C-alpha cells in the first residue's frame, strides 16, 4: 500500500521536472508548446509513461513533437538524474494524451444539443 503512494509521488515529481526541463533545457523547436499532463509509473519505478499534449491540432505537428520528445529522452533523463534523488532514473515512454481532445469533443457535442 505504501508503494502506491511512492509511485504517485515519484510520478508527480517527474511530471514537474520534465515540464521544467522541456521549458528551460531542451532547445528543440519540435517540443515547443508541449505540456506534460500526467506520468504513470510502473510499480517498481523502472518505467514512466509520460502523457503530453501539444497546442497544435495538426497531425504533422503531433508527429514532430513525438519525434522531438523521443530524441530529447537522453537529455531529459540526464537532467532528471541531476535533480531527483532516485537510485535509478526510470525509462521514459512518451504518449500523446487524447483525453483533453476527447473532452473538447464531448463539450462541443453538448453545446450542439443545447442549440437544437
From Swiss-Prot:
Q: Name one Pfam family in it.
A: RBFA
Keywords of this entry: Cytoplasm, Ribosome biogenesis
Q: Superkingdom, according to UniProt?
A: Bacteria
Localization of this protein: Cytoplasm
User: A Gene Ontology biological process annotation?
Assistant: maturation of SSU-rRNA
Tell me the PROSITE patterns matching this sequence: RBFA
Q: Per the record's keyword annotation, is Cytoplasm included, yes or no?
A: yes
GO: which molecular function terms? ribosomal small subunit binding
Quick one: where is this thing mainly located? cytoplasm
The UniProt record lists the keyword Cell membrane: no
Query: What InterPro entries is this protein classified in?
Result: KH_dom-like_a/b, RbfA, RbfA_dom_sf, Ribosome-bd_factorA_CS
- Gene Ontology CC entries for this record: cytosol
NCBIfam families, alphabetically? rbfA
Q: What does this protein do?
A: One of several proteins that assist in the late maturation steps of the functional core of the 30S ribosomal subunit. Associates with free 30S ribosomal subunits (but not with 30S subunits that are part of 70S ribosomes or polysomes). Required for efficient processing of 16S rRNA. May interact with the 5'-terminal helix region of 16S rRNA.
Q: How does this polypeptide assemble, per the annotation?
A: Monomer. Binds 30S ribosomal subunits, but not 50S ribosomal subunits or 70S ribosomes.
Q: HAMAP family, from UniProt?
A: RbfA
State the similarity comment: Belongs to the RbfA family.
**What name goes with this protein?**
Ribosome-binding factor A
* Species this protein is from: Streptococcus pneumoniae serotype 19F (strain G54)
**Which classification does the entry list for the species?**
Bacteria, Bacillati, Bacillota, Bacilli, Lactobacillales
Amino acid at each position: 500500500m505504501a508503494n502506491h503512494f511512492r509511485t504517485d509521488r515519484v510520478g508527480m515529481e517527474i511530471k514537474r521536472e520534465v515540464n521544467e526541463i522541456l521549458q528551460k533545457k531542451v532547445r528543440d523547436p519540435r517540443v515547443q508548446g508541449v505540456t506534460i499532463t500526467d506520468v504513470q509509473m510502473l510499480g517498481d519505478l523502472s518505467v514512466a509513461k509520460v502523457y503530453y499534449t501539444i497546442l497544435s491540432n495538426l497531425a504533422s505537428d503531433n508527429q514532430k513533437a513525438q519525434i522531438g520528445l523521443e530524441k530529447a529522452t537522453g537529455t531529459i533523463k540526464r537532467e532528471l538524474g541531476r535533480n531527483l534523488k532516485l537510485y535509478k532514473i526510470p525509462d521514459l515512454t512518451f504518449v500523446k494524451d487524447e483525453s483533453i481532445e476527447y473532452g473538447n469533443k464531448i463539450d462541443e457535442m453538448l453545446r450542439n444539443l443545447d442549440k437544437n
